[in-house]
């Protein structure tokens, strides 16, 4: 048995602070993933509905079984230290009201050792934490043809980027999910935040930037704005008002596809002096309006409004092992969703069971 090593210092100068248990960061992150992270991922994927909306699959509570082998056995026999993941899966037939519930095996999941490592095929490995840009709202400026350009970016933890810009023509533009730029006032009309020119002026002021933007904006109704935005986001697809509305809803306001995360919500609230609850991790109309007001004030050179330093550690965060694995698990679940929908449409509703619908291969492959 391995004896515990004791650290002894022969230095004459006392240490300024006791060395913290650095492995605890990895351990706590993984334990949080096993409980909260998996629950969040399953909740985001539920419910999965069939194309005719008759059948519905919902994920419930999950649990881990015991590892089949010890850490030492896995090292010696070139095996992976893992434990089975089991989840309650409920299948509901909305036409008959019949409910089938089963505890479904979701695959063997690599487990973390006490040293914060994983044993994969007998080899000890670690997941390295990443230093990434924190979700939130960021302001920047750059020179273009001798003119100062001001930009605002709303960056989520997961989902479409929203970028606003006061361009070299002094017009307020928006780019949704890195697509072609378009008038920001058209975007406000499409969302129903401000439909008429008077509404927009009342919301954002009557500056020269707003006047020039409204002059360029060809869509004067919400329906026109929705059609125009859909044309630019999905060129080639037949544009309809309903399709455009559901597209914008899915891109920016659907928790399954858009997530600021709690840290992103905190950063947005702090930057824009908002009081939105931390649990609200999708965009709100208030977020968009406050972002535009700050950008216009920044472009006008008003006191107290400044650009952000992207490289400042205050604008970065650590993405630890639990979050990294959760992101991979989320990818596997989204691939599995497509398989579940296909099987729902191919099998007889009365013969389907939760176990027959769930295919764990996409999840195992993603992890």
Where are the language model's segments positioned?
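N-terminal non-catalytic structural scaffold regions of very large proteins
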Residues: 1-367
């Amino acid at each position: 048995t391995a004896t515990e090593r004791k650290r002894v210092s022969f230095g004459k100068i006392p240490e300024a602070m006791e060395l913290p248990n650095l492995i605890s960061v990895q351990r706590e992150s993984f334990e949080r993933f096993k409980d909260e992270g998996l629950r969040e991922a399953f909740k985001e994927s539920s419910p999965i509905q069939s194309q005719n909306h008759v059948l519905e699959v919902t994920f419930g509570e999950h649990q881990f079984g015991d590892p089949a082998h010890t850490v030492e056995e896995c090292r010696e026999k070139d095996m992976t230290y893992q434990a089975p993941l089991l989840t309650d899966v409920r299948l509901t037939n909305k036409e008959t009201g019949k409910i089938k519930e089963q505890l479904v095996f979701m695959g063997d999941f690599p487990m973390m050792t006490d040293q914060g490592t994983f044993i994969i095929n007998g080899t000890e490995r670690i997941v390295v934490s990443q230093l990434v840009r924190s979700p939130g709202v960021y302001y920047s400026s750059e020179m273009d043809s001798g003119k100062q350009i001001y930009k605002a970016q709303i960056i989520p933890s997961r989902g479409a980027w929203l970028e606003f810009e006061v361009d070299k023509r002094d017009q307020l533009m928006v780019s949704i999910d890195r697509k072609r730029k378009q008038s920001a006032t058209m975007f406000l009309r499409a969302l129903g935040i401000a439909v008429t020119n008077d509404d927009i002026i009342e919301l954002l002021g009557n500056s020269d930037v707003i006047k020039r933007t409204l002059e360029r904006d060809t869509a004067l109704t919400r329906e026109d704005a929705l059609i125009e935005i859909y044309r630019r986001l999905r060129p080639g697809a037949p544009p309809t008002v309903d399709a455009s509305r559901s597209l914008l809803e899915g891109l920016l306001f659907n928790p399954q596809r858009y997530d600021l995360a709690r840290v992103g919500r905190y950063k947005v609230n702090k930057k824009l002096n908002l009081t939105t609850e931390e649990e609200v991790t999708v965009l709100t109309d208030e977020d968009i309006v406050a972002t535009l007001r700050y950008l216009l004030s920044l472009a006008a050179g008003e006191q107290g409004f400044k650009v952000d330093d992207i490289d400042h550690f205050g604008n970065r965060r650590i993405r630890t092992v639990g979050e990294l694995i959760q992101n991979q698990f989320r990818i596997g679940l989204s691939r599995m969703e497509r398989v579940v929908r296909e099987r729902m449409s191919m099998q007889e509703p009365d013969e389907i069971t939760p176990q027959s619908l769930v295919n764990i291969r996409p999840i195992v492959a993603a992890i």
